[in-house]
Curated annotation (Swiss-Prot):
Phylogenetic classification of the source organism: Bacteria, Pseudomonadati, Pseudomonadota, Alphaproteobacteria, Hyphomicrobiales
UniProt organism field: Bradyrhizobium sp. (strain ORS 278)
Protein known as: UPF0145 protein BRADO6695
Record family assignment: Belongs to the UPF0145 family.
HAMAP family noted in UniProt: UPF0145 (MF_00338)
Pfam families reported for this sequence: YbjQ_1
Length: 111
C-alpha cells in the first residue's frame, strides 16, 4: 500500500479538510482454493471449527483488494480514500470475490 495514502471508513479524516472528491474507486480480487485445499477444508467442516485454509485465503484476498483500491485511487490523483468498505460474494461453488471500495479524495491538513 502507498505510504502517503490515507484510508478511512469514515466520511471525513480528522485534522484534514476535503479539497475535492474524485469519485468511486475499487479493488477486486477473485480467489479459488485448489482441489487439495477444498478437500482439506471439507474434512475440517465435518469436525467443526475454523477452517484455517479459507481464513488465510480471505485475509490475503482482502489485503490484495485494498492494495488495488489504493492503486486505483492513486491513479485518479487522490491522496485519501474515505468511506472505505469491503464486500464479498461467492462465484460458483469454488470462488470468492472480495471488493474493497470507497471514495477517492484529495485532502489537506486543516488550518
Amino acid at each position: 500500500m502507498e505510504p502517503s495514502m490515507i484510508v478511512v471508513t469514515t466520511e471525513n479524516v480528522t485534522g484534514y479538510r476535503t479539497v475535492r472528491m474524485l469519485g468511486q474507486c475499487f479493488g477486486v480480487v477473485v480467489r479459488s482454493r485448489g482441489i487439495g485445499g477444498n478437500f482439506i477444508a471439507s474434512l475440517r467442516s465435518i469436525v467443526g471449527g475454523e477452517i484455517h485454509e479459507y481464513t488465510q485465503m480471505l485475509e490475503e484476498a482482502r489485503r490484495h483488494a485494498l492494495d488495488r483500491l489504493v492503486h486505483n485511487a492513486t491513479s485518479m490523483g487522490a491522496n485519501a480514500i474515505v468511506m472505505m468498505r469491503f464486500d464479498s460474494a461467492e462465484i460458483g461453488q469454488t470462488m470468492s470475490e472480495i471488493v474493497a471500495y470507497g471514495t477517492a479524495a484529495v485532502i489537506e491538513p486543516a488550518r
